[in-house]
């Protein structure tokens, strides 16, 4: 037995060593095949400002709504629907969906309007690389960036700022390019998606000095699917918006309108998210952006490349009929959706009224009744009503980093005019026997956006000197009367046109200078009130 023990011990040690070797090989193979990087799903990032990004706001029911899709057949160029609705009837596919691709490939297309000579574009699986967009971060508080130049806030797009995925074998024109930014090194096989010839045809510069949306499209590269890597995804439909004159209400309304039209033309089932592809600081007007859409975010707030499952490129506000109508005659008048549904008319529109209702509904304000404050004058005269007369004031406020805090006066004796109106109403010397007046001091700059819209909604008559604040009349109710006081230096048609396109009654008082005679204003208001039945 003693001679056999060493032999048995050797066999035992050999078997133990062999088993240990097998265990080492197994665990090494297992750890390499199931690494944490491969077992974890890709990170999905949702655009949001409130950690509720999965929630998309539904479209509200609007009395003036008319169908947007499909667009009208044989829509005449220059029709009211062409200007204000879905005139984007020519579809151009720059990258078609891959047949049998399982829905993971990219596509990119634009819808062109012959009337507006602009395009609404959309794409699937569009990758944005923030490091390839040169601009300030955006979204800062105003006081943090005082003195910053506007050029720093507007985007400059490097090649490949946006990318789509395409099979290299499917198209000619691919070349190997260096990739800069986005934490990527080396090179990638890519091609320019939209050439200059196509840009000139479908995204004309027109009179716009810096057409940032055209520049964005020009930056898009189609890369091989193997080079299209996305760690972060935005699953909800997202509008990409670049704003000019972002602190001015009139120009911001053109941006809101363009974003609304883009959402409707592309048939979005719910309200989209918005990504600002600019570097502007925050303003009070973002209250309305947030109310209108499902969420807002700034492009530079993304710290790494991000992919949008469905992105829509909203045309610049300068390309809307609201702006283009200032320099050219748009022969359209406002009408009710009910009338247009029964009797279509290429020279009439309800789209501006629909948009105004959208703003009111976004703030939770009623859209099915005209006003809330037409009430009996007293218990003894129950048939008489009180009408709100809103005097929209211009007041000093700090608008943007290059602003000194002083607004340019359009009516040098505005305070005197308002005080005279107030005294006229307060002393009961209006001479109106069938109704009363509630004069509202419209210091809008110091009101929330919701309260501003509510004041417009509740007004029967809106008075004001020419100024951006009057743009709120897009949200006015039917039968509202607009009374604009126009100084000799500001003979511009902005608000006369909006009133016309909404079908509102409009009166203008043209001044010989910048001073209005209070008695003349009172006489004109008396005339307007009598036309209301007072």
Swiss-Prot record:
One of its GO terms (molecular function) is xylosyltransferase activity. Its EC number is 2.4.2.38. It catalyses: N(4)-{beta-D-GlcNAc-(1->2)-alpha-D-Man-(1->3)-[beta-D-GlcNAc-(1->2)-alpha-D-Man-(1->6)]-beta-D-Man-(1->4)-beta-D-GlcNAc-(1->4)-beta-D-GlcNAc}-L-asparaginyl-[protein] + UDP-alpha-D-xylose = N(4)-{beta-D-GlcNAc-(1->2)-alpha-D-Man-(1->3)-[beta-D-GlcNAc-(1->2)-alpha-D-Man-(1->6)]-[beta-D-Xyl-(1->2)]-beta-D-Man-(1->4)-beta-D-GlcNAc-(1->4)-beta-D-GlcNAc}-L-asparaginyl-[protein] + UDP + H(+). It is a single-pass type II membrane protein. Residues 35-534 are lumenal. Pfam families: Glyco_transf_61. One of its GO terms (cellular component) is Golgi membrane. Changing residue 53 to A: Abolishes stability and activity. Pathway: Protein modification; protein glycosylation. Residues 1-11 are cytoplasmic. Glycans are attached at residues 51, 301, 479. Keywords: Glycoprotein, Glycosyltransferase, Golgi apparatus, Membrane, Signal-anchor, Transferase, Transmembrane, Transmembrane helix. The chain crosses the membrane at residues 12-34. Glycosylation at least at one of the two sites Asn-51 and Asn-301 is necessary for enzyme stability and activity. Renders plant glycoproteins immunogenic and allergenic in human. This is due to the presence of beta-1,2-xylose and/or core alpha-1,3-fucose which are not found in mammalian proteins, and which constitute epitopes for carbohydrate-reactive antibodies. Glycosyltransferase involved in the xylosylation of N-glycans. Possesses beta-1,2-xylosyltransferase activity, transferring xylose from UDP-xylose to the core beta-linked mannose of N-glycans. Involved in the biosynthesis of glycoprotein bound N-glycans. Does not require metal ions for its activity. This is Beta-1,2-xylosyltransferase. It comes from Arabidopsis thaliana (Mouse-ear cress).
